[in-house]
Amino acid sequence: MSGIDIHGDEVRASGVTVKLTNTGKVLFPADNITKGELIEYYGHVAGWMLPYLRDRPIAMARFPDGIAHQRIFQKNPADYFPDWVRRVEVKKQGGTLRHVVCDKAATLVYLANQACIEFHVFLSQVGSLECPDQVVVDFDPAGPDDFDAARRCALWLRDLLTGELNLTCYVKTTGGKGLHVHLPLNRHEDFEEARGFARDAANVLVARHPSVVTTEQRKDGRGGRVYADIMRDSYAQTVVAPYSVRARPGAHVATPLHWEEAADPGLTPARFTLRTLGERLAGTPDPWAGMSRHRYDVATARRRLAGLS
């Protein structure tokens, strides 16, 4: 485990001791994956995952009885969470809501011990929550067998953003049936501006590939096409975090990719799982490692996009 020492029912991480409970509990029945194995996974990937969690309020998808049972989608910390778990107040209509910020390995392990399988993060950071540092387009195919169509849409968006607008963007599998394309921003504009750019870019794809991709929100209006979803680009909304496990049979993982990997027609979501990702990380540098070097302002991006017409 990366920077973490595990001894029986205790883990030592980030200078604190996390007591583990009921590690033999099976969370993924079809795969016989236990809570202990989930904890081991998050301990192992902490060094890769934490940079994408740090300073971001999170939402937790917890499954105390396993994925076949009720999900607890939790934003606020429970009263019993230890003091060293960071909290932050997030403004909302009529007041504030307290969120957890997972900024150290001990918190990651502690939440895994709470049967938190999925980690979902804000697209903005503490100190500037109203201004995103990323914009994301979620390519959501009509069905689980349509992943390749979503893959092609992600490549088309890369060609638009990077090839035509000279904006470096990043891609990950969602761990579900689609992919996310992220564009890093410099936090100068609010979510409305960022979402406007995402909408404009998605509309270009629809104009170029109308039989494959749509921005129609109603499922019955999509006609089997890939949905280019930009609604996550809103204040206090979340997206699944890089390297998060998904609460689905197979324990697929939301995995950052090199664009060369996304270009592989044989790519499937099942390639990256809780049990296989360790080998990948041992041999593949983090595809998103350079993201902090590429930050764009939305106004410039929109001007470049408008210049195409």
Region locations from a protein language model:
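Signature for HUH/AEP ssDNA processing cores
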Residues: 100-175, 185-193, 309
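Short beta-strand
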Residues: 61-63, 169-175, 216-220
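Short secondary-structure junctions
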Residues: 51-53, 161-168, 209-210
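Long, highly charged amphipathic alpha-helices
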Residues: 44, 152-160, 196-204
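C-terminal accessory nucleic-acid interaction domains of nucleic acid-metabolism proteins
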Residues: 1-32, 39-40, 54, 94, ...
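A short beta-strand motif that forms the metal-chelation/ATP-contact edge
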Residues: 180-186, 227-230
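Charge-rich, low-complexity segments
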Residues: 1-112
